[in-house]
Design a protein with these regions (language model features):
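Anion (oxyanion) recognition and catalysis
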Residues: 22, 130, 240
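Rossmann-like NAD(P)(H) cofactor-binding subdomain of soluble oxidoreductases
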Residues: 2, 8-10, 14-22, 29, ...
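Rossmann-fold dinucleotide-binding core
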Residues: 74-152
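Short phosphate-binding/catalytic loops that engage adenosine nucleotides
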Residues: 26-27, 134
Length: 258
């Protein structure tokens, strides 16, 4: 019999993963806001996987509550995720999913490109998602994982920040074809921030090419999500801490304040 899987936060994405795991025969136990997570850890002391599926804005608060017994089998799927984010909670070998599909309320999930997975439970996750027709690519090294996390951050932050100053409902294809200079400039500044956060240097052309791949994975994907303003605020806070100029992104903030 397959071991139990715990999902902390059953939102739209969490629901997709729950479906995937259940269809592969894994018992799934949700942990919601109203539940005491320590009590759940006492009831399920040795889960196969603890997938933290909460939104980015709730990540720190939830991670601080993850019981010690669960930290060696933790899975993370948030955007804006980097190694320092899990190392801050003494998690050394998590399973990480760079999610490249979206799920909105009342709609089926939509795949952009294959999601990237790395870590002890990568095979379990990839097999489960592929069973519901969500393709995955298993990464073989931490260097690959770091690149893929940075790429996803560049994609999400670029389209969200650009979407704040362009017409409502603009798609990624329109951004890339009609506002390419804006998209590339924002992406370059986001890469600066990612390099400061990681202490690593990246091939910028490769990241820009990866951004374009994401754009054409779903050309009708809308740029500005509900979290766009919060992402801009976080980016500016990091840039201030790092002493980075990022003039185009700062101009966007100034424009929004007019």
């Amino acid at each position: 019999m397959n071991g139990p899987i715990v999902i902390v936060g059953i939102g739209e994405l969490g629901g997709v993963f729950a479906k995937a795991f259940l269809q592969k025969g894994y018992p799934v136990y949700p942990v919601t806001r109203s539940m005491n997570i320590s009590d759940q850890a006492d009831s399920i002391p040795q889960p196969e996987l603890v997938l933290v599926a909460v939104a980015e804005k709730d990540f720190k608060a939830v991670m601080a509550t993850i019981p010690a017994a669960w930290r060696n089998c933790t899975g993370l799927l948030q955007n804006e995720l980097l190694p320092r984010d899990w190392k801050a909670y003494d998690i050394t070998k998590p399973t990480i999913i760079s999610v490249w599909f979206e799920k909105k309320k009342g709609q089926e999930y939509k795949v952009l490109i294959p999601s990237r997975v790395h870590g002890p439970s990568a095979g379990l996750i990839a097999e489960s998602l592929e069973n519901i027709e969500v393709p995955c690519k298993i990464l073989s090294s931490e260097d690959e994982l770091l690149y893929e996390l940075v790429l996803k951050n560049v994609f999400v932050l670029t389209i969200n920040i650009a979407g704040l100053v362009l017409e409502e409902g603009i798609t990624t294809e329109t951004l890339w074809t009609q506002h390419n200079e804006l998209a590339r400039t924002i992406a370059e500044e986001v890469i600066e921030i990612q390099e400061w956060l990681t202490g690593a240097a990246f091939q910028r052309k490769r990241l820009i090419d990866g951004l374009a791949e994401g754009v054409y994975g779903d050309p009708q994907h809308r740029c500005k999500g509900r979290s766009a303003q919060g992402r801009l605020t976080r980016v500016l806070g990091i840039a201030d801490e790092a002493g980075l100029e990022i003039p185009r992104i700062r101009d966007i903030r100034a424009h929004l304040m007019l």
